[in-house]
From Swiss-Prot:
InterPro entries: Cation/H_exchanger_TM, FAD-bd_PCMH-like_sf, FAD-bd_PCMH_sub2, Na+/solute_symporter_sf, NhaP2, RCK_C, RCK_C_sf, Transptr-assoc_dom. Signal peptide: none annotated. K(+)/H(+) antiporter that extrudes potassium in exchange for external protons and maintains the internal concentration of potassium under toxic levels. It is found in: Cell inner membrane. This is K(+)/H(+) antiporter NhaP2. Belongs to the monovalent cation:proton antiporter 1 (CPA1) transporter (TC 2.A.36) family. NhaP2 subfamily. The lineage of its organism: Bacteria, Pseudomonadati, Pseudomonadota, Gammaproteobacteria, Pseudomonadales. Residues 403-485 form the RCK C-terminal domain. It catalyses: K(+)(in) + H(+)(out) = K(+)(out) + H(+)(in). SUPFAM superfamilies: FAD-binding/transporter-associated domain-like, TrkA C-terminal domain-like. Pfam families: CorC_HlyC, Na_H_Exchanger, TrkA_C.
Length: 580
């Protein structure tokens, strides 16, 4: 490769990445998932597009795809809270295993019939598109305000279901290449090996990396690089010994993100940029790889297969996978079924048959690409609409306009929160001493216009003041009520109900107040405990229960305990204006 070729490579790469970033602003305006924008830029620059770039290097696409996916999963694991596991771990694992099997089987049967393939080739297509995509899910769910049970289930599922899809794909390719026509017990043992070694190396490698980071004294910019290199080492080792590298790097990130770690905010900040670069690079390469005119001959059967998977296979897999978990409302199941987003993983898996030289390998790739495109356009575009229709959106928590970490101690979790005081806030005109600040927080600075003031207890807050507060992440809900822009009160009333009651209120007192019948229910128990029992599992904000003709909604939690409950009356029925 001469100097001119290298320079052209840099030039083309910089133009494509820059274009992807610039046109990504169209995503929110047009309501199109940003990943589709990246994919479209690659296709436009490709063989059939205006760029005319011929790219058919499948091993290179496989390399870029795996590297990008590893970085995205590492970042996703770092941002996943272990606390979300209390409501979603087992349901997500059920969907990641049983759900993928059901989706693979149903999609494979349809694929074999639609494309006149052997049943094992049909199953191979089903396995290739059988898993939801972490990059797509993390990208499209961020900031949507979904309830915790739905968000956690979808994110954990997308981070843990790739091993099953990879395993099924590799196994079926080996069977087709060797002429096998049946399954053996080795199939199950290999699956257990993938999950077992992946989990062991992911958690073990994450723990060792955590100890190394907290004991090393490095320049601040080197810690994120150490995390990335360590995560990739875990990924590669797990693959080398027959485990799941995808699961391993996700669990490695999960452990690092939920333990005190040196330079946490620097790591998260850089990983955020790297994850975006990985998504852009991966979808650009995959867009360049496809030849759009090859998709037209298979468009109708591929569209039928995509709709079959979206409307039949995915919903049935969710329905079967969530049977043991009664906490899930039908609305939540329907939304989880709809957000079975496919992304880069199926396209990367579709490269496997090409590299193995299987007959019909190009067909498998084109079908997988078409299904991903339909999934992102149909499911991804309709996600906000579906969330509102199925009522899985909860009113957002107020948040600071910015936050930054304070590395006071190697494992310090102190942060600086910046709040802009809007004129609608009740605290305008109040003295600082009147504010009920959370214990352990301090007001560090107050800006008025361009002036830095020295705040004291007698300082009166004015509209458009900027407050800087030092505290911890768990202080954010209380601080938000004091300083942040409050959400529309009408939105809260419409969602949580006409009145909000304390979860500790005695059920018999609530029944007496609202004229309700207990009908054998223990009236001595707290309202929150009764609602939790009716939900049938770990509660999340937004959970709803119908009882005595009223709608009871979980409005606030304290740990696993329901702290506040909203009550909504049917139209035309008034209730007492009291708070218990």
């Amino acid at each position: 490769m001469d100097a001119v070729t290298v320079n052209n490579f840099f030039l083309i790469g910089a133009v494509l990445v820059g274009m992807s970033i610039l046109v990504s602003s169209l995503s929110s305006r047009l309501g199109i998932p940003i990943l589709v924008i990246f994919l479209a830029v690659g296709m436009i620059a490709g063989n059939d597009g205006v760029g005319g770039i011929v790219f058919d290097n499948y091993p290179m696409a496989y390399l870029v795809g795996n590297l990008a996916l590893a970085v995205i999963l590492l970042d996703g694991g770092l941002r996943t809270r272990v606390s979300s596991f209390r409501v979603a771990l087992w349901p997500a694992l059920s969907l990641a295993t049983l759900g993928v099997l059901v989706t693979t089987g149903l999609t494979g049967i349809a694929a074999a019939w639609l494309f006149d393939l052997h049943w094992m080739e049909g199953l191979l297509i089903g396995a290739i598109v059988g898993s939801t995509d972490a990059a797509a899910v993390f990208s499209l769910l961020g900031g949507k305000g979904l309830n915790e049970r739905v968000t956690a289930t979808l994110e954990i599922e997308s981070g843990s279901n790739d091993p099953m899809a990879v395993f099924l794909t590799v196994t079926l390719i080996e069977m087709l290449a060797s002429g096998q026509t049946g399954l053996s017990w080795g199939f199950v043992l290999h699956l257990l090996q993938q999950f077992g070694l992946g989990a062991l190396l992911g958690l073990g490698g994450g723990w060792l990396l955590l100890q190394l980071i907290n004991r090393m004294h490095l320049a601040g910019g080197l810690y994120p690089l150490l995390v990335i290199s360590g995560g990739l080492l875990v990924f590669a080792l797990a693959n080398a010994v027959g485990g799941s590298g995808i699961l391993a790097i996700y669990l490695c990130g999960l452990l690092l993100g939920n333990r005190p770690i040196r330079s946490r905010h620097g790591i998260l900040h850089m990983l955020d940029g790297m994850a975006w670069l990985a998504q852009i690079g991966m979808f650009l390469v995959l867009g360049l790889l496809v030849t759009p005119h090859d998709l037209w001959p298979i468009a109708l059967p591929a569209l039928a297969l995509a709709l079959w998977m979206i409307l039949v296979a995915r919903p049935l897999s969710v329905l079967i996978g969530l049977i043991p978990f009664r906490a899930f409302h039908d609305r939540e199941k329907a939304f989880i079924a709809w957000v079975g987003l496919r992304g880069a993983v199926p396209i990367i898996l579709a490269v496997f048959p090409l590299m193995a030289g299987l007959p019909n390998a190009q067909l498998f790739f084109n079908v997988a690409f078409f299904i991903v495109l339909v999934s992102l356009l149909v499911q991804g575009t309709s996600l906000p609409w579906a969330a509102k229709l199925l009522r899985v959106v909860v009113p957002p928590d107020p948040a600071p306009i910015s936050r930054a970490g304070l590395e006071i101690h190697p494992t310090s979790e102190w942060e600086l929160f910046v709040y802009h005081l809007n004129k609608e806030k009740w605290c305008i005109g109040a003295a600082l001493r009147e504010l009920k600040m959370p214990e352990g927080t301090r007001i560090a600075a107050l800006f008025r216009g361009t002036q830095l003031l020295h705040p004291s207890g007698s300082t009166i807050l004015e509209a458009d003041d900027i407050l800087c507060v030092i505290g911890h992440e768990h202080d954010l809900p209380a601080l938000g009520k004091l300083f942040s822009q409050a959400p529309d009160r009408g939105l809260g009333a419409r969602f949580f109900g006409d009145f909000v009651l304390e979860g500790d209120a005695q059920l018999s007192a609530v029944a007496s107040l609202y004229g309700l019948k207990l009908d054998g229910v223990d009236g001595e128990q707290p309202l929150g405990r009764f609602i939790a029992h009716e939900i049938g599992g770990e509660a999340v904000i937004g959970d709803q229960v119908e009882w005595n003709g009223l709608t009871w909604t979980v409005a606030a939690l304290e740990g696993n305990r329901i702290r506040k409950v909203g009550v909504k009356f049917p139209e035309g029925r008034a209730g007492p204006g009291l708070f218990l």
